[in-house]
A protein has these predicted regions:
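Alpha-helix initiation/capping motif
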Residues: 44-48, 62, 159, 210, ...
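Glycine-centered secondary-structure boundary/capping sites
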Residues: 8-17, 101, 195, 207, ...
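Active-site-proximal alpha-helical
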Residues: 117-218, 223-225
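Polar/charged alpha-helical tracts
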Residues: 4, 8, 161-164, 168, ...
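Amphipathic alpha-helical surface "interface" segments used
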Residues: 23-32, 170-171, 221-228
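Non-catalytic terminal regions of proteins
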Residues: 216-247
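Intrinsic structural disorder
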Residues: 39-43, 113, 178, 202, ...
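Catalytic cores of extracellular degradative/oxidative enzymes
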Residues: 1-153
């Protein structure tokens, strides 16, 4: 069920793109804990007591395998540009976690904040941080919040297929050649998939902050978003002629 949920979430079933191959879950006898590789996901033998216990697997232990399978299904670079490797796979993790009836991990306490949500809103809404930056104040779970909020909002207004349609748009459109362009293209395609002008949403969450930094994400690269790139993307969204979200 875990694998099927992730496949359905990204529109593989809806758009007749289901993979005929199975997802391989391998037991590993080393110290790698859990990981995703090109042809399998691996789990150290010490985790078997939890992963092979149905009650634990479907509750406290669901995040790990959902996270690793999420890596296997990440769509690069459209929804996995530089800096998002340990972020956007967790959209899948959250979907699986909550689909199994568990509380969202984003409701967990974070430091002095009542939840990851609260700290994230402080970091982005109040401090006006660029979404791509991580440090002692912001981690991958804070970066995850806007992606999950898109799911929750579109679901609340009856758009159950938002991410299915967004993934399909990412699959059929031309990949961008830089991480910064990929981030901005995501804002455009998300607006298109939702039928809503999401400019203000992405402004609040730091996607439209100009930045030029070296970013480390397993490999290193330059992450550049300029004012002119931002202006061009905002205009493209405006040209879609979409209404703004309500509420």
């Amino acid at each position: 069920r875990l694998v099927l949920l992730e496949q359905q979430f990204m529109g593989l079933e809806k758009y007749d793109r289901m993979d005929p191959n199975r997802v391989c879950f391998s037991v590993m006898y080393n110290d790698s804990y859990m990981y995703s590789a090109g042809n399998h996901t691996g789990y150290v033998v010490g985790t078997m007591n939890e992963l092979c216990n149905l009650e634990k697997f479907s509750t406290t232990s669901i995040w790990g395998p959902a996270h690793e399978v999420g890596h296997s299904y990440q769509t690069k670079p459209g929804l996995c540009w530089l800096g998002m490797t340990e972020v956007t796979n967790n959209i899948h993790s959250l979907y699986v976690q909550t689909s199994f009836g568990n509380q969202s991990r984003l409701l967990d306490k974070q430091g002095d904040y009542t939840s990851i949500y609260e700290k994230s809103m402080c970091m982005y809404f109040v401090r006006k941080r660029a979404h791509i930056i991580t440090d002692s104040d912001v981690n991958v779970f804070n970066q995850l919040v806007p992606f999950w909020q898109l799911y929750l909002y579109t679901k609340a207004i009856g758009q159950e297929d938002f991410y299915k349609d967004l993934y399909e748009l990412i699959r059929i459109n031309t990949d961008q050649d830089t991480p910064g362009k990929s981030q901005l293209e995501f804002t455009f395609l998300a607006s298109k998939a939702s039928g809503l002008d999401l400019t203000e949403f992405f402004v609040k969450w730091g996607f439209f902050e100009p930045i030029d930094i070296e970013k480390s994400d397993y490999s290193k690269g330059q992450f550049v978003v300029t004012e002119s790139m931002i202006d061009e993307t905002k205009q493209r969204i405006t040209d879609l002629g979409l209404p703004k979200p309500k509420g």
